[in-house]
């Protein structure tokens, strides 16, 4: 459906998004009508979807959506939890009417009930799970678009977009791609610049995981406060007693203070200096008496 135009060709960043979300991974079963969209089969039995055909059918579905004058006449449905958030985001971006959750039987056929609708186009997430709206659409001649896996039945489906409709990342990415292409064909956003809305906003989030993340964030915040409290504790205050008279309790020697008249400098204190000249003369060591040698020979003096 790209018509050979370069502007409509699949970009490398789009292929990387498809591969990261696992859009090319089908199921282990294959419907005979989905055989034309399968590229190969892996050794573990999982079929690989041809992403080029996925992109072509995505462009065809976007053209069908843009052809509806009133965006509210486009009805998007997802009974599975993995596609409900993506459906709501798609309806918010394109102005479509959404039915998330359980589809009430007779919405398209029973004119008596208050929830009766007459859409001009129907888009479903899973033909197997959303079989009731597909069946009712066939009764009132409403064209249908569906995200189909390798084992999805194509009965009552007019435009099948081959992709992995089981994983929440793949489903969210496909709705994001479809919304972006619709806005580009309408001229709302430019093809020259990337869309500021991230695909993460279309992904389904489990409430239990959200609760666990909030609990972990709260525990982390409490731990951080305790950690800061240990290091930012106020230092102990040391108070010094006030002393009125610093000389109180200090022993002062009773020395008479000599008074000097004003203008007279006080004399320097006397320093006791010894007179080295009055010291006795050093003894003459040469005149010192020599000790008498003791008689080592005894009484005998004649050695011969």
From Swiss-Prot:
Keywords: Acetylation, Cell membrane, Cytoplasm, Membrane, Nucleus, Receptor, Repeat, Ribonucleoprotein, Ribosomal protein. The keyword Glycoprotein does not apply. SUPFAM superfamilies: Ribosomal protein S2. Transmembrane segments: none annotated. The record marks 115-116, 133-134 as: Cleavage. It is found in: Cell membrane; Cytoplasm; Nucleus. CDD domains: RPS2 (cd01425). GO terms for biological process: ribosomal small subunit assembly; translation. InterPro entries: Ribosomal_uS2, Ribosomal_uS2_C, Ribosomal_uS2_CS, Ribosomal_uS2_euk, Ribosomal_uS2_euk/arc, Ribosomal_uS2_flav_dom_sf, Ribosomal_uS2_vert. One of its GO terms (cellular component) is nucleus. The modification N-acetylserine is found at residue 2. GO terms for molecular function: laminin binding; laminin receptor activity; structural constituent of ribosome. Acylated. Acylation may be a prerequisite for conversion of the monomeric 37 kDa laminin receptor precursor (37LRP) to the mature dimeric 67 kDa laminin receptor (67LR), and may provide a mechanism for membrane association. Cleaved by stromelysin-3 (ST3) at the cell surface. Cleavage by stromelysin-3 may be a mechanism to alter cell-extracellular matrix interactions. Required for the assembly and/or stability of the 40S ribosomal subunit. Required for the processing of the 20S rRNA-precursor to mature 18S rRNA in a late step of the maturation of 40S ribosomal subunits. Also functions as a cell surface receptor for laminin. Plays a role in cell adhesion to the basement membrane and in the consequent activation of signaling transduction pathways. May play a role in cell fate determination and tissue morphogenesis. This is Small ribosomal subunit protein uS2.
């Amino acid at each position: 459906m790209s018509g050979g135009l370069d502007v409509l060709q699949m970009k490398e960043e789009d292929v990387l998004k498809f591969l990261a979300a696992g859009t090319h991974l089908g199921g282990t079963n294959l419907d005979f009508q989905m055989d034309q969209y399968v590229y190969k089969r892996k050794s573990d039995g999982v079929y690989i979807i041809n992403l080029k055909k996925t992109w072509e059918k995505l462009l065809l579905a976007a053209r069908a959506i843009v052809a509806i004058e009133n965006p509210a006449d486009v009805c998007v449905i997802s009974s599975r939890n993995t596609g409900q958030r993506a459906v709501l985001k798609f309806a918010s971006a394109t102005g479509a009417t959404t039915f998330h959750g359980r589809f009430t039987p007779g919405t398209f056929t029973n004119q008596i009930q208050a929830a009766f609708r007459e859409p001009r186009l129907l888009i479903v997430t899973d033909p197997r799970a959303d079989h009731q709206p597909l069946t009712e659409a066939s009764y009132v001649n409403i064209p249908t678009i569906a995200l189909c896996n390798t084992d999805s039945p194509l009965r009552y489906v007019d435009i099948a977009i081959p992709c992995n409709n089981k994983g929440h990342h793949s489903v969210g990415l496909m709705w994001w791609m479809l919304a972006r292409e619709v806005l580009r064909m309408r001229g709302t956003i430019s093809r020259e610049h990337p869309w500021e809305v991230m695909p993460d906003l279309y992904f389904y989030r489990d409430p239990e995981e959200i609760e666990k993340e909030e609990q972990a964030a709260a525990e982390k915040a409490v731990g951080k406060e305790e950690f800061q409290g240990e290091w930012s504790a106020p230092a102990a205050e040391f108070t010094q007693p006030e002393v009125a008279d610093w000389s109180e309790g200090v022993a002062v020697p009773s020395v008479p203070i000599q008074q000097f008249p004003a203008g007279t400098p006080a004399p320097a204190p006397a320093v006791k200096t010894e007179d080295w000249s009055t010291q006795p003369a050093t003894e003459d060591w040469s005149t010192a008496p020599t000790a008498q040698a003791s008689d080592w020979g005894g009484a005998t003096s004649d050695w011969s």
